[in-house]
A protein has these predicted regions:
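Alpha-helical transmembrane segments of multi-pass membrane transport proteins
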Residues: 1-425
């Protein structure tokens, strides 16, 4: 009977059944084989709904979808261009920063490629950058902001990790702060490589004038305060994360619907439905995955995995190397939400056993995922960019390779220099 269930689950996975159904079948089979009541799965679904922090997830997601429906991306690029366009290769640096900020606000790298790609790619080409460089930049920069507040994957990692008792506690705010330096490191390395690559070239600069800065800031006057209000409220203790998410949603609605009038009241319904369909899928997978995690804990799978790994891998450095290889492969094959709900419950106890703090693991996890998004042959952003820019995949492989190598250097530094993530703890 058990073997028949295993075969059915393998067939379900092979034919592309929804992830939640595969996880549900696996958890039910595990509990059935251990003579545990199957009601435990329903209990886990309720437990995840009863998590106050989870309120932030749909609210931040809705805000991101709403921003992507407006002209926020154009105003954001104009602000960055007015401030940094005078630098050598300034437009490329503008693109890096704008993509990182927009991904953080919307929570999805694919949205950044679609929304900013149409704006940045022609601008980079007209600015004198090669087509290969421009395409590679937009494709890879789409995932940079995953480490920056209020990134939805960052919140989701915190929610999952806090459900697992590993003897190390942390707050979501600590997780937000931990992502700042690693993101800045990536931006600095990418910008430095861009400057070196185009040294002595004829890339034109945009003349810096206070008039241009003032005009760009004025156009974006209702959106610029948003991150300062949210971050200031969270870090000062005025807002909890869930309250900050509510403030963000209300602020974005007021700015885009009432002040800018770029999203109509009628459109709010469709944006809400579209964003909540995504959130509903995440919550369904998350609840069932936590039920599956409960079975794994009862069966002592993480402990057995820990013992097995320590038999062959003695040092934390060796574990981190293996972890990076595994996560890069997963990032190329799974979307970030599926990877989080499946792997964090397995990896977190093992990582803590090697002396790795949960906050550091979270930054390593998401940094790997962002590189995995454009890792050949099946990184998700490669397919999105191929469709959006009508480029063959092989051309994108070549275009993204230099950026990938730079980010792998940053990833190694983030992995092996914990203070980059834990300086505030």
């Amino acid at each position: 009977m058990i073997w028949l269930g295993v075969v059915i689950i393998v067939i379900m996975a092979a034919i592309g059944a929804p992830l939640f159904s595969v996880l549900l079948a696996a958890s039910m089979l595990g509990f059935y084989s251990a003579d545990i009541e199957l009601a435990i799965v329903a209990i886990e679904l309720y437990r995840i709904v009863d998590t106050p922090l989870l309120v932030a997830l749909p609210l931040f997601t809705f805000s991101g979808y709403l921003l992507s429906e407006s002209n926020t991306s154009t105003r954001l690029v104009n602000v960055m261009q007015s401030l940094f366009g005078f630098l050598p290769s300034g437009l490329a640096i503008v693109a890096f920063i704008a993509c990182a900020l927009f991904t953080a606000l919307t929570g999805a790298s694919g949205v950044t490629i679609v929304a900013l790609g149409a704006l940045l790619l022609p601008a980079l080409r007209q600015g004198g950058f090669s087509e290969k460089f421009s395409t590679g930049l937009v494709t890879t920069s789409g995932s940079l902001g995953l480490l920056l507040v209020p990134s939805v994957p960052l919140i989701l990692y915190g929610v999952i990790a806090q459900q697992i008792d590993v003897g190390e506690s942390f707050t979501i705010v600590q997780l937000f702060v931990a992502g700042v330096v690693p993101l800045c490191l990536m931006l600095v390395l990418l910008s430095a490589w861009t400057l070196w690559k185009h040294r002595g070239g004829v890339i034109p600069r945009v003349r810096f004038t206070w008039a241009n800065v003032g005009s760009a800031l004025w156009d974006a006057r209702w959106e610029i305060p948003l991150p300062f209000v949210v971050l200031g409220g969270v870090f000062s203790g005025v807002f909890a994360i869930s309250e900050a998410a509510a403030v963000t949603a209300l602020y974005v609605i007021f700015a885009e619907v009432v002040l800018y009038k770029e999203v109509t009241v009628k459109q709010l319904g469709s944006v809400a439905v579209e964003s909540m369909v995504m959130v509903g899928g995440i919550l369904l997978i998350l609840g069932i995955a936590l039920g599956f995690t409960n079975y794994l804990v009862d069966a002592e799978v993480p402990q057995q995995l820990m013992v097995s790994m320590q038999t062959y891998i003695k040092s934390p450095l060796g574990f981190l190397l293996l972890l990076n290889i595994l996560l890069l492969a997963l990032g190329a094959m799974l979307d970030i939400f599926s990877a989080l709900v499946i792997m964090v419950p397995l990896l977190l106890p093992v990582a803590v056993g090697y002396g790795i703090h949960p906050v550091h693991l979270g930054i390593i996890f998401l940094a790997n995922m962002k590189v995995g998004y454009f890792t050949p042959p099946v990184g998700m952003n490669l397919f999105i960019a191929s469709y959006r820019f009508k480029k063959p995949l092989l051309e994108l492989y070549s275009a993204t390779l230099p950026f990938m190598l730079i980010l792998l250097v940053a990833l190694a530094m983030i992995t092996y220099i914990p203070v980059l993530s834990l300086w505030h703890m």
